[in-house]
């Protein structure tokens, strides 16, 4: 096992449902049940997911369900463990150079694509050549010091990554979050920036895609050529059920085998039929402040908003029990190896909030707050935030809507439609991976942050190879981001997966951030 830290997607997410797309009604659900194999089939595992992926293109997908689908069809060079370490997948071994300027990867031999063709270094080179192109939409991790990482073919089963400058985070950035695609299938594709590739997927993962019906389901069948061994379960259905309440009912009725549930749902489940698996995703749920909005350009106003909030109330109301959440104060999750609590915590102080508003010369401050209206936790928190800010004399209008639409708007340069927004991210352990959230021009910088101090600290820490010096830089960075008051970390909430007891080896399949299962092929039907 290689003791690297996994850098997960720079995902703009909302609550428990990272993707909120198609809004199917009862007719849609009936169609899904009749057209796709359902739970109870002794050869099919059915998992309820909360929406369609924003992209099924493995080159640029970065949302929960897009990555879940990708992880079933394709394979990366290494895979992530629940504790953030990684082990080899398509890689046989990985050799970082002593000077930190290159990384040699020896590939597994005798791996076949699902169509029977050989997997080789040509496929790896082809994949990274597409991934590194910024126009394709997910290249941030493959650029160091504003220069792209290069990849070279050494021989049929060896590739070499060449860095423009040493980077402490290079291994995490190179080795993760990229799924290898077959050159012989996609070599004639001219545009990899699209959300759906024109060719039928051919992969090295445990399953092959049979059918995708938007808003209803994905169906998969076992990949007979899977290098990890033929999956125990022949068929998998991902059934799209947007409502968590509807998914819970489907689980109780045996219409699906697994679903994500809320803490408040657990007491409703029959533990003789259903088992519950809470596990950490190192996810930060937060309140974001849009610094481009006129009302929030003054840092004192932003700080006033944060002092008016009470995160203990927000978490108790939404998650009920500390068994299901931890309370963060940094932009890093509480168990991150670089996290420090030596930052401004913005302990609740309504009077301090009023003083800051007075110093800023602001009266009658009115803001709006965007949140995912289909997410129960966010709906609860949005209402409480409105009440808490009112106590400091700040009026808040709630703007509930579709999560994907909200973050599509926030991603627009200089967007000012929303002042405040609820969101979340899962990024991994190396703080450099968080740069896309906070650096000027970052691909997921929904806060519209434009701080020279923050940019410089990210840049310095990325190339600092001395562990103690790097840790000190990240301490300074956490304080700088807190001082800017662009993000109010609220919660590190656990994901709670409820599974019908007819499904076995759940923990052996690996419960991990974003993807749910590290390797779904290890699941069994009892």
Predicted regions and their residues:
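Periplasmic-binding protein-like
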Residues: 270, 292, 296-335, 380, ...
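Ligand-site clamp/hinge motif
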Residues: 223-267
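Surface-exposed binding/hinge segments that line
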Residues: 95, 99, 142-186
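Gly/Pro-rich hinge or "lid" segments in bacterial periplasmic/extracellular proteins
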Residues: 175-230, 235
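Extracytoplasmic/peripheral linker and loop segments enriched in polar/acidic and small residues
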Residues: 397-400, 404-406, 435-501, 526
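Structural transition elements
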Residues: 323-359, 376-378
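N-terminal lobe/hinge region of extracytoplasmic solute-binding protein
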Residues: 48-96, 129, 202
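Long beta-strand-rich cores associated with HINT superfamily self-processing modules
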Residues: 497-526
């Amino acid at each position: 096992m290689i003791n690297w830290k996994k850098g997960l997607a720079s995902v703009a997410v909302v609550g428990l449902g990272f993707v909120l797309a198609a809004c199917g009604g009862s007719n849609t659900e009936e169609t899904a049940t009749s057209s796709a194999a359902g739970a109870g089939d002794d050869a099919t595992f059915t998992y309820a997911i909360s929406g369609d992926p924003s992209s099924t293109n493995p080159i640029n997908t970065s949302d929960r369900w897009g990555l879940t689908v990708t992880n079933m069809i394709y394979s990366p060079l290494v895979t992530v463990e629940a504790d953030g370490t990684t082990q080899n997948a398509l890689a046989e071994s990985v050799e970082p150079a002593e000077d930190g300027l290159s990384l040699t990867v020896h590939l597994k031999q005798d791996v076949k694509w699902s169509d029977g063709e050989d997997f080789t270094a040509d496929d790896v080179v082809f994949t990274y050549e597409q991934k590194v192109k910024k126009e394709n939409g997910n290249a941030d991790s493959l650029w160091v010091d504003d220069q792209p990482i290069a990849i070279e073919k050494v021989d049929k089963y060896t590739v070499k990554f060449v860095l423009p400058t040493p980077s402490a985070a290079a291994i995490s950035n190179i080795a993760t979050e990229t799924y290898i695609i077959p050159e012989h299938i996609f070599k004639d594709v001219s545009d990899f920036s699209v959300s759906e590739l024109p060719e039928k997927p051919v992969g090295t993962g445990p399953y092959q895609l049979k059918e995708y019906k938007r808003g209803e389901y994905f169906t998969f069948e076992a990949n007979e050529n899977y290098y990890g061994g033929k999956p125990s379960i022949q068929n998998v259905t991902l059934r799209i059920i947007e409502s968590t309440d509807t998914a819970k009912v489907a689980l109780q009725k045996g219409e699906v085998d697994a679903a994500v549930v809320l803490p408040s749902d657990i007491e409703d489940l029959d533990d003789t039929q259903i088992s519950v698996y809470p596990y950490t995703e190192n996810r930060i749920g937060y309140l974001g402040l849009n610094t481009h909005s006129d009302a929030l350009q003054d840092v004192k106003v932003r700080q006033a908003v944060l002092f008016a909030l009470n995160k203990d109330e927000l978490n108790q109301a939404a998650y009920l029990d500390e068994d299901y959440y931890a309370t963060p104060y940094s932009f890093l999750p509480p168990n991150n190896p670089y996290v420090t609590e030596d930052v401004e915590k913005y302990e609740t102080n309504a009077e301090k909030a009023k003083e800051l508003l007075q110093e800023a010369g602001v009266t009658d401050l009115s803001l709006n707050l965007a949140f995912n209206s289909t997410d129960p936790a966010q709906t609860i928190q949005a209402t409480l935030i409105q009440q808490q800010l009112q106590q400091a004399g700040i009026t808040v209008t709630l703007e509930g809507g579709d999560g994907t639409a909200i973050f599509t708007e926030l991603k627009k340069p200089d967007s000012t439609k929303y002042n405040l927004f609820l969101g979340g991210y899962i990024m991994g352990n190396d703080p450099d991976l968080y740069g896309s959230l906070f650096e000027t021009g970052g691909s997921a910088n929904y806060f519209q942050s434009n701080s020279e101090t923050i940019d410089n600290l990210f840049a310095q820490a990325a190339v600092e190879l001395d562990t103690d010096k790097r840790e000190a830089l990240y301490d300074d960075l956490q304080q700088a981001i807190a001082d800017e008051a662009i993000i109010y970390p609220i919660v590190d909430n656990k994901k709670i997966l409820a599974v019908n007891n007819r499904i076995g080896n759940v923990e052996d399949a690996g419960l991990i951030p974003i993807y749910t299962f590290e390797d779904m092929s290890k699941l069994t039907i009892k």
